[in-house]
C-alpha cells in the first residue's frame, strides 16, 4: 500500500508547471470589506404595501360559520355559475363525481382517533361520470341527489384519473338552516 502511494505521489510530482497552475489552492473566505456596499436606511414609504385595501379586509369569524369546500367563502352559486364550474372541470379533463353527506364537515363522534365515518369521506351518488361532456348532465344528477336526500349536503368533485387526485371540490346544495 505504501509503495502504491509513493508511485502516485511520484506521478503527481512529474506534472508540468502549466498543469499545476490550473488549480488554485483554497485560500480561505474573503472578507466582505473588498466589496462596495451602499447602505440604505429603512424608509417605510418605500416598503411594499397593500395601501388602503387593508382597511377593507375582513377576518373570517372563527365560530358560527363553517368553512366547507373550495368556494365556501363566496355566496351560494347560481345554477349558471354551477354550470360554468362544471364546464371548467370537464375542460380540464377531470371526472365529475357527486357526493353527499349528512353533516358536511369533518367531525368525530364516538372516538378521538380519526375513523371512516367522521365526515372526511362522503357517500358517492351513483358512479363517477366518466365520459361526461356537458354540465347539464351533471346538474341533472345534482338535482336528483338533492331531491332524494334533502337534509344532506351535496358537492361536486373533479377527479383527475391520470394523477389519481381530487383537483376541485365545491358545494352544490346546503340543507335548510345551514
Curated annotation (Swiss-Prot):
<feature type="transit peptide" description="Chloroplast">
    <location>
        <begin position="1"/>
        <end position="55"/>
    </location>
</feature>
<keyword id="KW-0601">Photorespiration</keyword>
<dbReference type="Pfam" id="PF12338">
    <property type="entry name" value="RbcS"/>
</dbReference>
<comment type="similarity">
    <text>Belongs to the RuBisCO small chain family.</text>
</comment>
<dbReference type="GO" id="GO:0019253">
    <property type="term" value="P:reductive pentose-phosphate cycle"/>
</dbReference>
<comment type="function">
    <text>RuBisCO catalyzes two reactions: the carboxylation of D-ribulose 1,5-bisphosphate, the primary event in carbon dioxide fixation, as well as the oxidative fragmentation of the pentose substrate. Both reactions occur simultaneously and in competition at the same active site. Although the small subunit is not catalytic it is essential for maximal activity.</text>
</comment>
<keyword id="KW-0602">Photosynthesis</keyword>
<protein>
    <recommendedName>
        <fullName>Ribulose bisphosphate carboxylase small subunit, chloroplastic</fullName>
    </recommendedName>
</protein>
<dbReference type="GO" id="GO:0009507">
    <property type="term" value="C:chloroplast"/>
</dbReference>
<dbReference type="InterPro" id="IPR024681">
    <property type="entry name" value="RuBisCO_ssu"/>
</dbReference>
<keyword id="KW-0809">Transit peptide</keyword>
<dbReference type="GO" id="GO:0009853">
    <property type="term" value="P:photorespiration"/>
</dbReference>
<dbReference type="InterPro" id="IPR000894">
    <property type="entry name" value="RuBisCO_ssu_dom"/>
</dbReference>
<dbReference type="InterPro" id="IPR024680">
    <property type="entry name" value="RuBisCO_ssu_N"/>
</dbReference>
<dbReference type="InterPro" id="IPR036385">
    <property type="entry name" value="RuBisCO_ssu_sf"/>
</dbReference>
<keyword id="KW-0150">Chloroplast</keyword>
<keyword id="KW-0113">Calvin cycle</keyword>
<dbReference type="Pfam" id="PF00101">
    <property type="entry name" value="RuBisCO_small"/>
</dbReference>
<dbReference type="GO" id="GO:0016984">
    <property type="term" value="F:ribulose-bisphosphate carboxylase activity"/>
</dbReference>
<comment type="subunit">
    <text>Heterohexadecamer of 8 large and 8 small subunits.</text>
</comment>
<keyword id="KW-0934">Plastid</keyword>
<keyword id="KW-0120">Carbon dioxide fixation</keyword>
